[in-house]
């Protein structure tokens, strides 16, 4: 009988094997078949079997505790008996795990087609099965397989949240997305059409205001490098507009405007040019206050204001105004 660590190691070996053989014809199906044949050799358990195994596991754990933490000296015979109980407990643990591996496969198959290979789903489910066995309390009267189902599903959905999505989502959100996707498929089969958000909200118990958000989260991301078009030579990113980019016409107009402004300013006295450049941030885009400009040139606030007014008056007259008028329209 294999130990629990052997169960974990075997699933990891199957998982690694699937990655090494991706170039073979349908290697995953072959590995799943081998795995199913292996786990199918252990008979299923009834409720009485589960309780008996759980009791044996509990006794084994207590015996292991006594061996490691006993406050009283243990005789050789006592140690021998305790070691036997530990060994029997570990066998029972392995038996309980192996008898429920088919349950993991059954649940894992329900999550295929969502971005994660079946063997990876099984691996995650097996971790949930081990966790269920560690938490199982036979004295409460639950059947182990019923109790383990919740832990297996939780482990699979969390594994999917961590591994299958390019953009990871919180676990609670993944569970809601999965629930809504399942309901959406079922309602499509019943209605023969896509269900409305209102219908999905009523069926799922999720607020209608959250439905659209969850549906968006359920969509798989698309790479901007994905080839599109008839010849599939151009990447998708080439067809998406950059709303923040400056178009060619705007760039030309901006260049001409700056050139004309420089030409107009060159007709002013140097101090007038400096004051206007600082006042309107023409060089660095940062406008200065009258006080800031006054401190820089040793002028009063009112004198700076006077220079600004004089310049504005000059710019409204003659050729200077004509050159700038086009940009004010």
Swiss-Prot record:
PROSITE patterns: SIGMA70_1, SIGMA70_2
Chain residues forming the annotated DNA-binding region: 290-309
The entry's keywords: DNA-binding, Sigma factor, Transcription, Transcription regulation
Positions of short motif Polymerase core binding: 120-133
Keyword Transcription: yes
Domain of life: Bacteria
Cell cycle listed as a keyword: no
CDD domains noted in UniProt: Sigma70_r4
Positions of the UniProt region annotated as Disordered: 1-27
GO biological process: DNA-templated transcription initiation
Bias kind Polar residues: ranges: 1-12
A Gene Ontology molecular function term of the record: sigma factor activity
SUPFAM superfamilies, A to Z: Sigma2 domain of RNA polymerase sigma factors (SSF88946), Sigma3 and sigma4 domains of RNA polymerase sigma factors (SSF88659)
Role of this protein: Sigma factors are initiation factors that promote the attachment of RNA polymerase to specific initiation sites and are then released.
Family according to the record: Belongs to the sigma-70 factor family.
Protein name according to UniProt: RNA polymerase sigma factor SigB
Organism name: Corynebacterium diphtheriae (strain ATCC 700971 / NCTC 13129 / Biotype gravis)
